[in-house]
């Protein structure tokens, strides 16, 4: 019996996450109010002039999936246990990567459960649509508070990469593209054919300093064949034409050790560092572990060496292969590249410039002096 359970453990895991009710009759969680700070994992103090912030960009981070499913199609944002997990594990590994890059905006949203990415049911697509509506509303508020001289970075992980692709489609195919430093869409497939249809104004990045472009990869360790096949063949990609599987489509793969799309092998000496942080304060900076893996793009997948530290191994638990890792192997690579691309965008001169407010200068009082009449007879 135990042998059968182990053999069919993925099917068992999937069945356990089924909410057991149609999405149409499902009592949806209350929508977040993005005017309220409690609906954000990270948001800057909007009362402080962005000109005074030590960084130059604004970064919108769409967090990965932490909710497996079971009771709900979508995560209620008042689920204190999962929200705590987001704050304790997701934030230090995936959000605070960009602390030194820009002002951070990371909304809580009614993320679709992991189960919705394991089934082809229409209910799953509707749950993902609900999640995107939250992300879109949060991004609209982000834009209202983002000064026009500040570069923008979009960072989405796993489910967040799916929604990030749609943000690019809906907002960055016109003049806003000039403010885009880069979009990091990590852990969900981005087919190259999208750049001929939905993403014509935001092409793939080709170098480490390209701006207004997209970086994307799905990274897999040795032994990850099951989830690699799922990534490249079965996950659905949303475009204006609807949801279509990733199968038989060439996928964008950016090697984060080289910052290009080549199939060259990048040795571990190029790896700037990963972290496996937990419970850190937002201001804390974890110490990255460097030179952990080599990496190579092959067939649209980023194939990794086995990491030197066990901290980056997949947790051995039911459904562990499908869950977001409690670590970010490319934390330091992303941080440094984000800074590089922001500076590159500013150097293009395409963004408006802003001078320091006159309020910060000393005011010199001018005192009238008597005017002596000119005597023309002298």
Residue ranges of predicted features:
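Active-site catalytic motif of lipid deacylating hydrolases and related acyltransferases
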Residues: 9-25, 62-150, 306-377
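Surface cap/lid and interfacial helix-loop subdomains adjacent to catalytic sites
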Residues: 134-148, 169-314, 319-340, 344, ...
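Structural recognition of the beta-strand scaffold that forms the well-ordered cores
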Residues: 58-61, 105-108, 153, 182-185, ...
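Hydrophobic membrane-insertion alpha-helices, especially the h-region
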Residues: 1-7
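Proline/glycine-enriched tight loop/beta-turn segments at coil->beta junctions
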Residues: 51-57
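N-terminal module-boundary/linker segments of secreted carbohydrate-active enzymes
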Residues: 7-47
């Amino acid at each position: 019996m135990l042998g059968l359970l182990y053999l069919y453990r993925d099917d068992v895991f999937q069945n356990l996450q089924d909410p057991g009710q149609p999405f149409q009759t499902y009592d949806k969680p209350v929508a977040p109010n993005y005017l309220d700070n409690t609906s954000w994992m990270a948001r800057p103090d909007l009362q402080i002039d962005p000109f005074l912030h030590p960084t130059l960009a604004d970064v919108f981070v769409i967090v990965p999936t932490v909710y497996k499913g079971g009771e709900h199609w979508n995560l209620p944002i008042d689920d204190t246990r999962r929200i705590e997990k987001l704050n304790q594990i997701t934030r230090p590994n995936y959000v605070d990567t960009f602390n030194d890059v820009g002002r951070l905006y990371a909304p809580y949203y009614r993320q679709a459960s992991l189960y919705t990415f394991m089934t082809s049911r229409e209910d799953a697509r509707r749950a993902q649509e609900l999640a995107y509506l939250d992300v879109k509303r949060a991004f609209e508020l982000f834009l209202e508070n983002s000064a026009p001289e500040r570069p923008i970075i979009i960072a989405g992980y796993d489910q967040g990469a799916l929604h990030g692709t749609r943000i690019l489609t809906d907002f960055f195919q016109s003049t806003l593209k000039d403010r885009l430093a880069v979009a990091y869409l990590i852990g969900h497939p981005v087919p190259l054919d999208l750049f001929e249809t939905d993403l014509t104004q935001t092409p793939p990045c080709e170098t480490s300093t390209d701006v207004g472009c997209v970086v994307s990869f799905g990274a897999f360790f040795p032994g990850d064949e099951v989830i690699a096949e799922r990534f490249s063949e079965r996950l659905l990609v949303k475009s204006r034409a609807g949801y279509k599987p990733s199968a038989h489509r060439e996928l964008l793969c950016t090697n984060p050790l080289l910052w290009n799309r080549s199939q060259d092998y990048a040795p571990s000496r190029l790896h700037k560092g990963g972290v496996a942080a937990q419970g850190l304060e937002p201001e804390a900076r974890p110490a990255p572990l460097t030179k952990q893996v080599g990496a190579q793009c092959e067939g649209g997948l980023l194939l990794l060496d086995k990491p030197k530290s066990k901290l980056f191994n997949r947790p051995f638990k039911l459904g562990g292969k499908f869950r977001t890792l409690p670590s970010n192997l490319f934390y330091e690579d992303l941080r440094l590249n984000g800074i590089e691309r922001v500076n590159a965008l500013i150097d293009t001169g395409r963004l408006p410039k802003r001078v320091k407010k006159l309020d910060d200068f000393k005011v010199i009082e001018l005192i009238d002096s008597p005017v002596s009449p000119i005597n023309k007879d002298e």
